[in-house]
Amino acid sequence: MAPNTDIGLIGLAVMGKNLVLNMVDHGFSVSVYNRSPAKTEEFLKDHGESGALQGFTTIQEFVQSLKRPRKIMIMIKAGAPVDEMIASLLPFLEEGDILIDGGNSYYLDSEQRYVDLKKEGILFVGMGVSGGEEGARKGPSIMPGGNIDAWPAIAPIFQSIAAQVDGRPCCSWIGTGGAGHFVKAVHNGIEYGDIQLICETYEILKTRLNLSLEQIGNIFFEWNQTDLNSYLIGAAAAVLIAKDENGNAIASTILDVAGQKGTGRWVAEDAIKAGVPMSLIIESVLARYLSTWKEVRTKAAQEFPGIPLLCQPPQEASAFIEDVREALYAAKIISYAQGFMLLKQVSQDKGWDLNLGELALIWRGGCIIQSAFLDKIHQGFENSPEAHSLILQDYFKKVLFDSETGFRRAVLHAIGSGVAIPCLSSALSFYDGYRTVDSSLFLVQGLRDYFGAHGYERRDCPRGEFYHTDWLETKKTFRV
């Protein structure tokens, strides 16, 4: 009889398979189960020679093969399939066993599973895993949350297989309930913003300087040696430069209709519910929706050719490229600032006590948004933990101050020439709104009071005191 294994994994799609192989590489024995026995058999045939893998065709045998407390990682489609799998496992589990959902589950679903399984004596962990296929195989960024009692038993496994940066694993305990999956979702939302900013930057360079895919790819490659060094800038350079066997640019064949799996929309909705102005992430989600209207956009382009105010390209190409680089970096700061504002707000609302600086360290390796920039964020939270946002931390204040002129020039060029830049323009608008002392929003309150008697606060009175004006007759104001 084979010895019991260290951990079990359910779901042998790409992410599941690569996580298993990563665990085996780090000396852990793994039991695997897939609803399709053929997939399990094929996986064992390809990778079972080490003896560290065991495959099973029934849930009961799978569970019985594990060392106690049993540690089971579920890597299947989010939603109802996860609940169905948990229900099928429960009859064979014992108090103290650990269930880990490593998929892209919505954090409120994870909160409910945490509560429900705690009643059964089962330790539930909602674990965000970022890095895609390559990260899962070579070292992902891992964000575990849920029942803290599970952490001592699973930490040796997941901190071993996680990406390592400066000798530190990109994996640490996040918080209770759905904290792990929420942090992963915000990561994905920030990723949406990063990608959209890169796309808009590409479009400005292409339109205003008439540059080729390869030329812009080379610019991105150069930028990747600067403060903008990141996985996504490097990936964008690689995609733009790549050629097929005939020497043609592969990127030129890709249809401009962008897909999404829903995590960006979740974060946009969560930001609105939390009252956090996460405008870049929201705009990046909307840009993908607009991209799906390909036929409508094609017709609209014929009906509305546009009336550009800027017809001539910039006089100094190199200076303009630097303006665009500054715009990208400034907008990236604002995007991350918004993301961390949401993390901070929801952490306060939920009582998670998230360590925001630690999150920046977890994201430095193995994940899609990994970048040198995250070190600056960690340092910022270490040096100025009381700051309302990244924007008010010393390093980022200086960057925004130094890059503001180039940022504005790049946005002016784009808008003046009819280039859609929803995230870059949103970033600049947020920056200007954030630093505005007296905004026009007083008129919102005046109008709400005019048509709905909602009341308003006065500039010359303490906050929290509300007043109503009889706008239609006496014009008298009184406290309500």
From Swiss-Prot:
Q: Name one GO molecular function term.
A: phosphogluconate dehydrogenase (decarboxylating) activity
Q: Which family does it belong to?
A: Belongs to the 6-phosphogluconate dehydrogenase family.
Q: Does this UniProt record's set of keywords contain Oxidoreductase?
A: yes
> What is the protein's known function?
Catalyzes the oxidative decarboxylation of 6-phosphogluconate to ribulose 5-phosphate and CO(2), with concomitant reduction of NADP to NADPH.
Query: What UniProt keywords apply to this chain's record, in alphabetical order?
Result: Gluconate utilization, NADP, Oxidoreductase, Pentose shunt
Q: Can you quote a single GO CC term?
A: cytosol
Tell me which domain of life the UniProt entry assigns to the organism this sequence originates from: Bacteria
Q: Which residues form the active site?
A: K184, E191
- Where along this sequence does the record place binding of substrate? N104, S130, G131, G132, H187, N188, Y192, K261, R288, R448, H454
Top-level class of the enzyme under EC nomenclature: oxidoreductase
> InterPro entries given for it?
6-PGluconate_DH-like_C_sf, 6PGD_dom2, 6PGDH_C, 6PGDH_Gnd/GntZ, 6PGDH_NADP-bd, 6PGdom_BS, NAD(P)-bd_dom_sf, Pgluconate_DH
- Please list the reactions this protein catalyses: 6-phospho-D-gluconate + NADP(+) = D-ribulose 5-phosphate + CO2 + NADPH
Record SMART domains: 6PGD
| Protein's UniProt name | 6-phosphogluconate dehydrogenase, decarboxylating
Instruction: Name the Pfam families for this protein.
Output: 6PGD (PF00393), NAD_binding_2 (PF03446)
Origin species, per record, is Chlamydia trachomatis serovar D (strain ATCC VR-885 / DSM 19411 / UW-3/Cx)
